[in-house]
Amino acid sequence: MSKIVKVIGREIIDSRGNPTVEAEVHLEGGFVGMAAAPSGASTGSREALELRDGDKSRFLGKGVTKAVGAVNGPIAQAIVGKDAKDQAGIDKIMIDLDGTENKSNFGANAILAVSLANAKAAAASKGMPLYEHIAELNGTPGKFSMPVPMMNIINGGEHADNNVDIQEFMIQPVGASSVKEAIRMGSEVFHHLAKVLKGKGMNTAVGDEGGYAPNLGSNAEALAVIAEAVKAAGYELGKDITLAMDCAASEFYKDGKYVLAGEGNKAFTSEEFTHFLEDLTKQYPIVSIEDGLDESDWDGFAYQTKVLGDKIQLVGDDLFVTNTKILKEGIEKGIANSILIKFNQIGSLTETLAAIKMAKDAGYTAVISHRSGETEDATIADLAVGTAAGQIKTGSMSRSDRVAKYNQLIRIEEALGEKAPYNGRREIKGQA
């Protein structure tokens, strides 16, 4: 009953108004899975390729009809008749047929959409929720946890049109007893932050991920206004709520220096920027820093890991691009201590699960993440619970493309109850 009978690809629109690929996988017995590929703004150079048409007369060149054509053509022909429950087999067929290292033939957006739709169809045929099916694919049946959210409430960098260099300033409601309570705490801080910003005469328009995007005097001022909002919401910073940052440092790395517009165009060496971040962690309870240096600055990362790695979580995003080959090298060289997991960086569910497993086996944490270009697809919520990853990054408390994932987590927690504990601070590297 889990034989694939039909595969459909289509072009839909993401949260930035750009096209993306949606796929449907139909099985015998009428079971259907549907999924859409997300899309990033600040991307690592070694990510799997997102195939765009390049036809400037359509969607400013961002159309995905070639990728959709791959879904409806060669991919469909290759997997119709196969067993959807064999996720690794389905993914391997698509990857082998594409034949390139970075999935540039069909596009990672085509392969991923089909990979996720296939998993959803297989889960439906087994009569189980997606998170339960993912736990089985992961070799950890029945093992679940609810992730601690990293809520991006101030957006800068490539996600906003402001003068803030650091791309994301996040809160983590570590003192909550459930994901539902964590989401409530995040929502309350988010609304108090609007009041704080308005009180200072600042803009409360939101960026790509639903966080506010004000012009601030410095990067540290973003932390200061968040601290004010946490207090106004009645929470204790450092106890109830901790802070996290995504520097996306590759975006302000120029000619071997880190140039910060928000600090008066000051240029830092790798070591100086690491100490700039270290100073911030002394002023505020920052427990996680992502991409604290450029993706190619491995010597700098080794130094940063030496200085900060035993105190806080250092997450590699552009650094590792959800790629087991690169992650393996990072583990061997002692670079960072956590990986950001974005399944469109690698392009299939099977490879995503392999990256999570490799990280956990090495004592690294794995943070499941959205992209800045999203849809209503909430698969990452199921992925976080089904792999018991422990942390999720899916934006702020506004925009339906972000909130869809939080709402799915609320539903899953309700269904699983005590089978899926919310472990709070213990999930974050260096905070147990």
Curated annotation (Swiss-Prot):
Residues at which Mg(2+) binds: D246, E290, D317
Catalytic activity: (2R)-2-phosphoglycerate = phosphoenolpyruvate + H2O
CDD domains per UniProt: enolase
Protein name: Enolase
PANTHER family registered for this protein in UniProt: ENOLASE (PTHR11902:SF1)
Cofactor binding notes: Binds a second Mg(2+) ion via substrate during catalysis.
Claim: Secreted is one of the keywords in the record: yes
Principal location listed in the UniProt entry: cytoplasm
Subunit structure: Component of the RNA degradosome, a multiprotein complex involved in RNA processing and mRNA degradation.
Residues annotated as catalytic: E209 (proton donor), K342 (proton acceptor)
Role noted for this protein: Catalyzes the reversible conversion of 2-phosphoglycerate (2-PG) into phosphoenolpyruvate (PEP). It is essential for the degradation of carbohydrates via glycolysis.
Residues the record lists as binding (2R)-2-phosphoglycerate: Q167, K342, R371, S372, K393
UniProt-listed Pfam families: Enolase_C, Enolase_N
UniProt xrefs under NCBIfam families: eno
This protein's pathway: Carbohydrate degradation; glycolysis; pyruvate from D-glyceraldehyde 3-phosphate: step 4/5
Keyword Lyase tagged: yes
Cofactor: Mg(2+)
Organism: Cronobacter sakazakii (strain ATCC BAA-894) (Enterobacter sakazakii)
Keywords carried by this UniProt record: Cytoplasm, Glycolysis, Lyase, Magnesium, Metal-binding, Secreted
Gene3D superfamilies named among the record's database cross-references: Enolase-like C-terminal domain, Enolase-like, N-terminal domain
E.C. designation(s): 4.2.1.11
Family: Belongs to the enolase family.
Any one biological process term the GO annotation gives: glycolytic process
